[in-house]
Amino acid sequence: MKFLVIGLGSMGKRRIRCLQALGFQDIVGVDVREDRRLEAQTSYGIQVHSDYADSLKQHTFSGVVISLPPLLHVAAMQACLKHSTPFFVEASVVDDGLADIIHAVKQQGLLAAPSSTLHFHPAIACIRDIVASGALGTLSNVILHSGQYLPDWHTYEKVSDYYVSTPATGGAREIVPFEMTWFTEVFGFPHNVACHFRKTIHIEGAEGIADTYNAVLDYGSFLANVTVDVVSRQATRRLLINGSKQQLVWNWEDAAVNVFDGASAQWTHLPYDSGTSAAGYNKNIGENMYIDEIRAFVDAIEGKAAFPNSLDNDHAVLKLLYRLESTDAVGMAQVMSP
């Protein structure tokens, strides 16, 4: 199988490593930046080009991996549609032109695989199974905190030098749908939502973006509180689920999902292995989930299994983000001083 990777930044390089980990060596990488092309060619021994439109004309690919900044996704997907080539696309935060892409994909019957990385995290898989089993009892409330420190994302370049510094594709804004993709898979979509988002601290290069989102999701029978930020000096992902029978606690620092049973007053610890992390990445960001995600894309190309995410679902998650943001304008009740 032959693959085209469009975009040779941090995610494009990661996807090349994933493909090579799966045994694929016939890879063409595309980037407009000469330094990135040279790095990918030297580090991974792949062919490189500067224009993906030309690459799609010159070669026949089994699949395309789109690892560009979000605002460039649609043009790359259109190119894949033009050449009837299955594609995988990184998580996005903007939906301009996406409805037309979805329509065209359905008309062609083309495989489109939008990223759902955390679906493949062993902790999320464990949590998904536990919630679905009903073992926790009747759910009461859920608390999720996903926090990172924006300058830690790309230590080799300034925040102002790439897309996370602009309002439409800001770092915190991007992580909301990244988390909501797995969250809605586990709990479904909420009935009602409320959210406030703000810029709270100074981060050089991120002056124009909100760095913190606080949301309340109303599921009717239970409530969820979700905080996403890019101001956490230690990268954090913590989840608490309160049920009538059991309480589930996950802190990714522990490498285990922990469940407290009310009847026995005992904890059950469910350890997992997310694999080693690549150089320069947080130790909790193991490579296995990224490899498994690309494996799922390859399996979908070969007709072995459906990819676990769709553009329709991706669009629904983005609409959830926009609905959350729209509620911020409603304002809040003033608390009077005693």
Language model: regions and residue ranges:
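N-terminal Rossmann-like dinucleotide-binding module
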Residues: 1-44
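Conserved SAM-binding strand-loop segment of SAM-dependent methyltransferases
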Residues: 45-52
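Beta-strand-loop-alpha-helix segment that lines the small-molecule cofactor/substrate pocket
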Residues: 58, 63, 69-70, 74-119, ...
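C-terminal helix-rich "cap/oligomerization" subdomain common to oxidoreductases
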Residues: 63-66, 292-338
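Glycine-rich, N-terminal phosphate-binding loop of Rossmann-like dinucleotide-binding domains
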Residues: 67-68, 146
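Predominantly a Rossmann-like dinucleotide-binding segment in NAD(P)-dependent oxidoreductases
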Residues: 118-196, 201-205
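Contiguous beta-strand/loop segments that form the cofactor/metal-binding neighborhood of enzyme cores
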Residues: 175-256, 284, 291-304, 323, ...
